[in-house]
């Protein structure tokens, strides 16, 4: 008896329709694409109760002819193609004839339409779940078509319940999809409205029939986003992308849109390449981009998935390589932006004058060091500020020389005022003893070098002249490749690089000579009298390596007494130790019935209450026993996690009113999420006023921001919370800055590594872990506990 039977047509229809219409976004997508295919220039999308009650798309397209009323909802009836070969020259979004038929299968569909010749009289078509025409009514209607889908997924109970449960998330996905179509559709006006039970019809987003994609981006995402974009037009590529600078990109990749011939598609490989190219320019940030690829229809296959967003490219590798090279060239042409610090001088100096004993005293240089015109220009795009550890670079003398090169071709700062009187007197007082000490130090160096040379049978004695004629003029550092940089090893000051002409110095053999040179005030040129001997003469005198006969080596011997009984004892002891180590590192047979017990160990929070503290190891870890297992618990990480969750649960956020309220420039989806979660946002300390009469994106005004001691939060923290709520509306999010602040505070107040604990204190730390929601890691990611071994294996 045959068990293979055909599926009835009704079941086939429901199964296939469930693949095409999977959520609110896919339903809206099919309706909007039908409107675009009809040649509409104005498209209006209306949601009632987040799409749960109804979704309606109204356009001013060509309308539906009277001869198509009966077949408009039938499966695989379409006006787009007649045979498979037409796909190679396809110019429309749809081609399967499944959209309206699938919508009929999962909801109640009502179509109102009128052609150019019929308007202002139109027809209302009521379709059943099979797509058949139930009845037809004459109504007043302008040219175009309206498709309304009521009670979406009424025939699929599981999907209906999921929609009612996750309606905000599904609505956000639909709005994001409409943002993409509104962005790519030039010369077309998009309007999206939403109406709930407690509010009137609210505009979510709109465009103004713009001729350029960037204007659409400005309408949809706001001026802040559009102003951070640059055009990307190269061959098959047209569109806009974020500037490769920090501040122009975003923390998430939710605003990345790829189109092929203006069809929204998923191309993960291309998106990944764009992300990789941007990574060196903006770490941990994602660029915004809206890119359309103009590709010949014959080289792409769009008949891959029910939603037509997955495509195959015959020349994918070549296209990816072209996009990569094009984007790299675009990023390199943009240069790299460095924020200017207009309130700081281009250079900051702090002088450090070492005295004869190596101690140092900070001296102030003149505060006014005017630079050349190129350095003081307001149009400068480079701001240079020395860190505290690098400021003490200038050693003062009676006539100090300051020479700092910022970049190739940069002008040098000129000293315009004399040194302070106190600094001049101090410098004059030091100048004479300094020369005397240099001379004495040089004499001592001669003697030590002579002793060193004679003791090692070498003739490489060098002498350092006792006089060091110094030149003080302000010169630009020499480009001579023989210049040598010697680091100052003096512990009394920050290491300073000294410029010494290699052609004028004889040699330096140990740290004392380097220290002697470093104690001299910094100059651009330092000359030493004696010259380096020729290479040939130096090699002839070199006697460092001498061959020695093998029998000249020292010989050592020692008598060892060995007894047979001692060897036997050692063997027994080694065997016992080997058996013990094998038990600890036992390898279990994979066929063992209890193999999972050896590989997995489950610990529940309640187990912390039953753990017995054995003691403390290395003043950093608590050793505990639970059942047959031995654990170590990190005392600092565990206490830190307890303090962190305690601070988080008892956090009181204070708000600081803004002197001037700030109008928020938000995307439509961000604004919707903020309005839907306004009570939660206000509990986070953000005071927000809402004016529904304003245009979309500017309805919210920031009145106050949360503060905590010296930390003041801003709009970036608010946007981060909104982003989390859009993805996970059921959680209570904290901004990452607040998380870091609480983690830092918890860390500082926790038990530190190195502190000896009593048994009572160790028990308290272990018991606290049972009270936490997630006790397994500290806020910084370090695990709180580790399993050591099973006691039965010892």
Curated annotation (Swiss-Prot):
It holds the Pfam family DNA_mis_repair. SMART domains: DNA_mis_repair, MutL_C. InterPro entries: DNA_mismatch_repair_CS, DNA_mismatch_S5_2-like, HATPase_C_sf, MutL/Mlh/PMS, MutL/Mlh/Pms-like, MutL_C, MutL_C_dimsub, MutL_C_regsub. GO terms for cellular component: MutLalpha complex; nuclear chromosome; nucleus. Residues 351-384, 409-442 are annotated as: Disordered. One of its GO terms (biological process) is meiotic mismatch repair. Keywords: DNA damage, DNA repair. One of its GO terms (molecular function) is ATP hydrolysis activity. Residues 352-371, 430-442 have a biased composition (Polar residues). Residues 419-429 have a biased composition (Basic and acidic residues). PROSITE patterns: DNA_MISMATCH_REPAIR_1 (PS00058). This protein is involved in the repair of mismatches in DNA. Belongs to the DNA mismatch repair MutL/HexB family. This is DNA mismatch repair protein pms1. It comes from Schizosaccharomyces pombe (strain 972 / ATCC 24843). The gene is pms1.
């Amino acid at each position: 008896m045959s068990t293979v039977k055909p599926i009835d047509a009704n079941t086939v229809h429901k199964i296939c329709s469930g693949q095409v219409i999977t959520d609110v976004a896919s339903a809206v997508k099919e309706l909007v694409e039908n409107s675009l295919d009809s040649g509409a220039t104005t498209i209006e999308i209306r949601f009632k109760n987040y799409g749960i009650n109804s979704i309606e798309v109204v356009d001013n397209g060509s309308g539906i002819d009277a001869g198509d009323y009966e077949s408009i909802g039938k499966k695989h009836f379409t006006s787009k193609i007649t045979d498979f070969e037409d796909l190679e020259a396809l110019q429309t979004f749809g081609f399967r004839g499944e959209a309206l038929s699938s919508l009929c299968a999962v909801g109640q569909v009502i179509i109102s339409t009128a052609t150019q010749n019929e308007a202002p009289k139109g027809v209302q078509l009521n379709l059943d779940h099979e797509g058949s025409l139930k009845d037809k009514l004459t109504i007043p209607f302008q040219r175009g078509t309206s498709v309304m889908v009521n009670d979406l997924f009424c025939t699929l109970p599981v999907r209906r319940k999921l929609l009612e449960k996750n309606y905000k998330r599904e609505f956000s996905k639909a709005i994001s999809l409409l943002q993409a179509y509104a962005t790519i559709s030039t010369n077309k006006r998009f309007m999206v409205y939403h109406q709930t039970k407690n509010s009137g019809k609210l505009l979510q987003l709109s465009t103004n029939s713009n001729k350029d994609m960037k204007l659409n981006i400005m309408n949809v995402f706001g001026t802040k986003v559009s102003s951070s974009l640059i055009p990307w037009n190269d061959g098959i590529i047209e569109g806009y992308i974020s500037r490769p600078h920090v501040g122009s990109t975003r923390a998430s990749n939710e605003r990345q849109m790829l189109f092929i011939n203006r069809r929204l598609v998923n191309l993960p490989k291309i998106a990944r390449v764009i992300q990789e190219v941007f990574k060196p320019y903006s770490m941990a940030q994602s660029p915004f981009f809206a890119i359309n690829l103009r590709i010949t229809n014959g080289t792409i296959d769009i008949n891959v998935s029910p939603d037509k967003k997955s495509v195959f490219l015959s020349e994918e590798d070549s296209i990816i390589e072209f996009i990569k090279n094009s984007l790299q060239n675009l990023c390199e042409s943009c240069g790299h932006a460095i924020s200017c610090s207009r309130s700081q001088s281009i250079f900051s100096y702090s002088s450090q004058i070492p005295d004869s004993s190596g101690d140092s005293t900070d001296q102030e240089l003149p505060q006014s060091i005017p630079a050349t015109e190129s350095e003081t220009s307001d149009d400068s795009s480079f701001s240079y500020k020395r860190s505290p550890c690098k400021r003490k670079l200038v050693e003062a003398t009676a006539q100090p020389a300051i020479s700092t090169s910022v970049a190739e071709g940069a002008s040098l700062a000129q000293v315009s005022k004399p040194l302070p009187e106190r600094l001049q007197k101090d410098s004059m007082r030091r100048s004479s003893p300094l020369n005397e000490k240099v001379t004495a130090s040089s004499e001592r160096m001669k003697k030590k070098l002579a002793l060193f040379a004679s003791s090692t049978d070498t003739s490489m004695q060098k002498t350092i002249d006792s006089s060091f004629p110094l030149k003080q003029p302000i010169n630009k550092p020499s480009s001579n490749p023989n210049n040598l940089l010697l680091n100052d090893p003096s512990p009394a000051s920050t290491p300073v690089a000294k410029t010494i002409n290699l052609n004028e110095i004889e040699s330096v053999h140990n740290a004392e000579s380097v220290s002697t040179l470093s104690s001299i005030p910094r100059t651009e040129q330092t000359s030493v009298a004696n010259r380096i001997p020729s290479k040939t003469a130096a090699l002839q005198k070199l006697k460092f390596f001498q061959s020695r006969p093998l029998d000249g080596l020292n010989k050592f011997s020692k008598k060892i007494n060995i007894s047979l009984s001692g060897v036997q004892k050692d063997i027994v002891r080694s065997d016992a130790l080997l058996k013990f180590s094998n038990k600890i590192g036992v390898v279990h047979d994979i066929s063992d019935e209890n193999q999972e017990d050896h590989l997995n160990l489950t610990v529940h929070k309640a187990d912390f209450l039953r753990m017995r503290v054995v003691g403390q190891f290395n003043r950093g870890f608590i050793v505990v026993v639970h059942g047959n297992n031995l654990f170590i618990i990190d005392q600092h990480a565990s206490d830190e996690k307890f303090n962190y969750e305690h601070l988080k649960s008892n956090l009181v956020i204070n708000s600081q009113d803004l002197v001037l309220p700030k109008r928020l420039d938000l995307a439509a989806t961000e604004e919707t999420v903020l309005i839907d979660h306004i009570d939660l946002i206000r509990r986070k300390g953000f005071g927000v006023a809402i004016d529904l009469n304003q245009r979309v994106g500017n309805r919210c005004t920031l009145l106050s921001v949360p503060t905590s001691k010296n930390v003041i939060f801003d709009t970036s923290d608010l946007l981060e919370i909104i982003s989390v709520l859009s993805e996970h509306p059921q959680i209570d999010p904290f901004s990452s800055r607040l998380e870091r602040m609480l983690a830092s505070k918890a860390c500082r107040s926790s038990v530190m590594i190195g502190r000896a604990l009593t048994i009572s204190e160790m028990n308290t730390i272990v018991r606290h872990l049972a009270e936490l929601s997630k006790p397994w890691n500290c806020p910084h990611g370090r695990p709180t506990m580790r399993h050591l071994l099973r006691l039965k294996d010892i």
